[in-house]
Swiss-Prot record:
Location(s) in or outside the cell: Cell outer membrane; Bacterial flagellum basal body
Disulfide bonds: none
Signal sequence region: 1-15
Main subcellular location: membrane
UniProt family annotation: Belongs to the FlgH family.
Name this protein carries in UniProt: Flagellar L-ring protein
Organism placement in taxonomy: Bacteria, Pseudomonadati, Pseudomonadota, Gammaproteobacteria, Vibrionales
Membrane topology, record value: Lipid-anchor
A Pfam family the protein falls into: FlgH
GO annotation terms (biological process): bacterial-type flagellum-dependent cell motility
Organism: Vibrio vulnificus (strain CMCP6)
InterPro entries assigned: Flag_Lring (IPR000527)
């Protein structure tokens, strides 16, 4: 009887060790693989008549679509007593470095983006027509109508068009933002995402960044340049009074569209 009880106990313990780790609520509620880069936009809703009139919704800090994803908690395994100080759970490679390689690891992105665009177009079109006909003569005499009008004419037409257009745009952003790894792809690349909020007197400013990086591009000081981020999404904007003053009112936008 004791042997049967012992076998049953060992079977139950073995089954518990083979169970999948329990996912924490923050992992379950976090973003999925599909919206890992751009964020979950299914819950974007207007916060009232103010957002409706100004035609936009301000982002908020602590958005679940931009929340960090922490590593899953591994279940505890009870190892058999061998009398040795060696533990497989604390094994590390002697030649390994400390670069981010797993979900939840932190990396600093150096923002150094500069773009310049210019375009110009010139158009110069002209067209002229000149047509004439001498009077008709019959028997050496001009053919006239009612003794006053002959069949001669002289027509001249000229059209000219000149157009000149040019457009220039330049943008630059520099700084730092620390993000976290939210997914490790099958080829070893890392999907990163993070945000930073700055609370000012009359509003908030935020920086959001997401994209995919290679571990080989990470420098020894755990930083990577923003131009090394693939499929990068960089947002730098603000909320509050200063941001509202930079945009035209809804009446101005209405009349601009109507005209």
């Amino acid at each position: 009887m004791k042997r049967i009880s012992l076998i049953a106990l060992v079977t139950i313990m073995s089954g518990c060790t083979m169970l999948e780790p329990i996912e924490t609520p923050e992992v379950v509620n976090a973003t999925t693989v599909v919206d890992a880069v751009e964020g979950d936009k299914s819950k974007d809703e207007s916060s009232g008549i103010v957002d409706t009139l100004r035609g936009r919704s301000d982002p908020v800090a602590g958005d679940p679509a931009w929340a960090p994803i922490h590593p899953k908690q591994q279940p505890e395994h009870y190892a058999a007593e061998t009398g040795s100080l060696f533990s497989v759970n604390h094994l590390s490679n002697l030649y390994d470095d400390s670069k981010p390689r797993g979900v939840g690891d932190i990396i600093t992105v150096t923002l150094d983006e500069k773009t310049n665009a210019s375009k110009s177009a010139n158009a110069d079109l002209s067209k002229s027509n000149d047509s004439s006909m001498d009077p008709l003569e019959v028997g050496g005499q001009e053919l006239k109508i009612d003794g006053k009008y002959n069949f001669s004419y002289n027509l001249t037409n000229s059209n000219n068009f000149t157009g000149d257009a040019s457009a220039k745009q330049s943008n630059s952003i520099s700084g730092y933002i620390t993000v976290e790894v939210i997914e490790v792809l099958a080829n070893g690349n890392l999907v990163i995402r993070g945000e930073k909020w700055l609370t000012l007197n009359t509003g908030d400013e935020y920086i959001r960044l997401s994209g995919t990086i290679r571990p080989d591009d990470i420098s020894f000081d755990n930083t990577i340049a923003s131009n090394r981020v693939s499929n990068a999404r960089i947002q730098y904007s603000g909320t509050g009074t200063q941001q509202d003053m930079q945009e035209p009112g809804f009446l101005a936008r209405f009349f601009n569209v109507s005209l």
